[in-house]
Structure formats: structure tokens, C-alpha cells
């Protein structure tokens, strides 16, 4: 199931750097993290759903690349983001 518009707007409001910000790295990573967590729950119930598993891996790779970009360009923003999202990195 895709992320609802209300939930996405809630995440955007929480992680936006300024009003109208929908494309910053923080917002993209936060939305991807929600989607990854949601897909993880689905995969736990439906272990043989390989198409969803592949989509999950693509989202994880996209988030990894965005986090690497943020870490390379602004370490402080990177640390704040991983702490607020509760990521293990």
C-alpha cells in the first residue's frame, strides 16, 4: 500500500527545512524510511512476495545513496537526521 497523502504531508511538515520544501534530502529520506518500515511489515507476513522484496531493496538503496550524499556534504545535518529517524548508522 502506498503512503497516503495525509501521512506524507505530516512527514514533510516534520522534516522540511523551510515552508514548501518537499525535495530536500531530509524529506526524501524520511519518506523513504516510512515506506521501508511499512514494506518490512508486509514482507514479514508475506515471505514469498519477491516483487515487494525487490521494491524494498530499491528503496533501501535509494535511501543509502541519499544518506551518503548528505554525510559527504553536511555531516551535522546527517547526524541530526539519523538521530531523529532512529537509524542505526
Swiss-Prot record:
Decide whether keyword Heme is in the record: no
| Pfam families given in the database record | Ribosomal_S15 (PF00312)
Q: Which organism is it from?
A: Streptococcus pneumoniae serotype 2 (strain D39 / NCTC 7466)
Protein name (Swiss-Prot/TrEMBL): Small ribosomal subunit protein uS15
> What role is this protein assigned?
One of the primary rRNA binding proteins, it binds directly to 16S rRNA where it helps nucleate assembly of the platform of the 30S subunit by binding and bridging several RNA helices of the 16S rRNA.
Q: Which family does it belong to?
A: Belongs to the universal ribosomal protein uS15 family.
Query: What's a single GO MF annotation on this record?
Result: rRNA binding
> Which UniProt key words apply to this protein?
Ribonucleoprotein, Ribosomal protein, RNA-binding, rRNA-binding
What is one GO cellular-component annotation here?
cytosolic small ribosomal subunit
A Gene Ontology annotation in the biological process aspect, one of them, is:
translation
Name of the gene encoding the protein in the UniProt record = rpsO
Q: Which InterPro entries match?
A: Ribosomal_uS15, Ribosomal_uS15_bac-type, uS15_NS1_RNA-bd_sf
Q: Which domain of life is it from?
A: Bacteria
| Subunit comment | Part of the 30S ribosomal subunit. Forms a bridge to the 50S subunit in the 70S ribosome, contacting the 23S rRNA.
Amino acid at each position: 500500500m502506498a503512503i497516503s497523502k495525509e501521512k506524507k504531508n505530516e512527514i514533510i511538515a516534520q522534516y522540511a527545512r523551510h515552508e514548501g520544501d518537499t525535495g530536500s534530502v531530509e524529506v526524501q529520506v524520511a519518506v523513504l524510511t516510512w515506506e521501508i518500515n511499512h514494506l518490512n511489515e508486509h514482507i514479514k507476513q508475506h515471505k514469498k512476495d519477491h516483487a515487494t522484496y525487490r521494491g524494498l531493496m530499491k528503496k533501501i538503496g535509494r535511501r543509502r545513496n541519499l544518506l551518503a550524499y548528505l554525510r559527504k556534504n553536511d555531516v551535522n545535518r546527517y547526524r541530526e537526521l539519523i538521530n531523529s529517524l532512529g537509524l542505526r548508522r
